[in-house]
From Swiss-Prot:
Species annotation: Hadronyche infensa (Fraser island funnel-web spider)
Function: Inhibits various C1 cysteine proteases. This protein has no toxic activity and its function in the venom is unknown. It may play a role as a housekeeping or regulatory protein.
UniProt tissue specificity: Expressed by the venom gland.
Pfam family, one: Cystatin
GO cellular component, one term: vesicle
Entry PTM: Contains 2 disulfide bonds.
Name of the protein described by the UniProt record: U7-hexatoxin-Hi1a
Amino acid sequence: MKTILLFLGVCAVGASMMTGGWTNKDVNDEEVKKLAIFASTKFNEKSNSLVFEKMCKILEAKSQLVAGMLYDITFEASPTVCKKNDKNYVPIYQCPLLPCAPRKI
């Protein structure tokens, strides 16, 4: 199993928020979804897998206010049938999962 964690610094932070520990975020929050998709895309760019991996479900999301904002997002991902070297580009959201493929965290 893999743990895919996303740590992103976001510069624009309101001064009214206190810095410190991790705060749980709603996994259905639109910002969390966008950041998880971004992390999944970066993972696919850097992995040596022959096929794309697709995010299936966000399991947990947390944020921490420091000099910017850090995010820790854990999600399940599974391999798809879409090959990275295929000349007929298919957007990742249209790629079906491999049958009986194990989900990775």
